[in-house]
């Protein structure tokens, strides 16, 4: 179920990036974060990333983190989380989705 949610949540940030495509292509969404505190007065991209990671944590669990890397309009979106409770040990998972903007 977590893997499916990671794919769905990747689509969520992709939609936000397409709505702000110029900034996305310029790298405004690039980075990796587990932080949901956000910065007051930040950019639309910052707000989108904060909302996305908050949604990841609600859907997948508090260990969820997100990474976006866009270069020349091609973006890799990665969702990573630890599912050790479900697998009775350390179990780090990641799902990467590649999209063209």
Located regions from the model:
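Flexible, low-complexity segments enriched in proline/glycine/serine and punctuated by aromatic residues
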Residues: 1-101
């Amino acid at each position: 179920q977590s893997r499916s949610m990671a794919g769905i949540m990747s689509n969520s940030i992709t939609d936000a990036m397409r709505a702000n495509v110029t900034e996305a292509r310029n790298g405004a969404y690039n980075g990796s974060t587990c932080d949901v505190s956000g910065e007051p007065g930040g950019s639309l991209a910052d707000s989108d990333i904060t909302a996305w990671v908050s949604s990841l944590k609600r859907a997948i669990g508090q260990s969820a983190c997100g990474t976006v890397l866009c270069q020349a309009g091609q973006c890799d979106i990665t969702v990573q989380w630890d599912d050790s409770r479900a697998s009775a040990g350390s179990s780090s998972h990641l799902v990467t989705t590649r999209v063209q903007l």
